[in-house]
Amino acid sequence: MNDPMDENNLLNDRDMIKDGHGKKQRPNTSKAAALVILFGVCLYLAYSTLFTEKQQPVEVQKEGIIKQTELFRPAPPKPVSLEPTIEKNNVLLPKVELPTPPKKTTNSDDSLLEAAQRAPVLAYANTQKGQGSTEKNKDISANQPEAKPDETAQRFNHLLKPTTLEGIRAAKLGNRNYIIAMGASIPCILETAISSDQQGFASCIVSRDILSDNGRVVLLDKGTQIVGEYRAGLKKGQKRLFVLWNRAKTPNGIIITLASPATDALGRSGMDGDIDNHWLERIGSALLVSIVKDATNYVKGRLPKDQDKNNSETISSGQNIANIAVENYANIPPTLSKNQGEMVNVFVARDLDFSNVYKLKVIENKKQIVNRALSRNFYKNSAVICNEPKLAHIER
């Protein structure tokens, strides 16, 4: 009843069905494998994020605030040791105890003082950061333009300010009978000759009597010796030599410091004289160089070519020596010479006071009649005693 063909067909159909189911189930297995892989990746990421060691972050120093726990108290002053001191007479003095001032008690209810004492102190740990910030601030301030005031307003304010002039009070010169005032001129005859090649001293003799400022008393007698000094060396173009007169000595042995410069008859500073510019030495050195050069060139031309190389150093050395001689003679400074017996002047640069060495005595003319009934000090008011220009006689 059962046909074998039918069974074979059924078997083939089943195989066909299995093959069809198999083909349909392949996509499902691939999806499952993808899900498994995705799940594994998720597990790996979760494991790596949860169980791996965390990197320690870089610690950044923060500004710490240190709170003050105790009240601010200033440092107590050091006590002064009052030990017995030893005097010059080697006597020990007893120890002295000074009364100490009472301590001031502060009220604890002063809230402002207590708040100031308990105020927190800010401590900055990172100094480099602070320095960098200050430098940045300086750079920013340097880049910013400076705020200049209004120039017109500043000028106007300056114009409104008057010029302040300090007043100078007049003073008395003193007793003019004893004073040679500044600005006086003392004629003097040179006692020694002067040459500016070397520095040295000079002396001169006063040619006439030098009177006081009022012209009544002779303070520097004729024949007074004045000593001075001068420096060496004149610069090129100078024709006057500076001389400083230091001291004057009268024939009676009275000395006084002058510290005054020398002048000529017209009051020009310095001392003139004969100037020697040493033209002969300068021109002679130049001629020497030219002669040496011509001679070396002539000798060089007469030498054969073989000996020219050997003698070139000798010829060049001769030219160098001549050049050095020219340089030395070209820098010779001029020389000023002044002979003895010539007239010079001394310009008094300060007031000369002779009151501590001279004393005046009032003298009377025998032919003059004086009213003795006058109650007057004749020493101070000498015009009553003598009407002549000559007032007094110096007692030395």
Curated annotation (Swiss-Prot):
InterPro entries: T4SS_VirB10/PtlG, T4SS_VirB10/TraB/TrbI, T4SS_VirB10/TrbI. The keyword Zinc does not apply. It comes from the Bacteria. Residues 126-144 have a biased composition (Polar residues). GO terms for cellular component: plasma membrane. NCBIfam families: T4SS_VirB10. Residues 1-29, 126-150 are annotated as: Disordered. It is found in: Cell inner membrane. Residues 12-22 have a biased composition (Basic and acidic residues). Its main location: membrane. Belongs to the TrbI/VirB10 family. This is Type IV secretion system protein virB10. Induction: During the interaction with the intracellular environment of host cells. The chain crosses the membrane at residues 32-52. The type IV secretion system VirB/VirD4 is a major virulence determinant for subversion of human endothelial cell (HEC) function. VirB-dependent changes of HEC include massive cytoskeletal rearrangements, a pro-inflammatory activation by nuclear factor NF-kappa-B, inhibition of early and late events of apoptosis, leading to an increased cell survival, and, at high infection doses, a cytostatic or cytotoxic effect, which interferes with a potent VirB-independent mitogenic activity. These changes of HEC require the T4S coupling protein VirD4 and at least one of the effector proteins BepA-G. It is a single-pass membrane protein. Interacts with virB4, virB8 and virB9. Keywords: Cell inner membrane, Cell membrane, Membrane, Transmembrane, Transmembrane helix, Transport, Virulence.
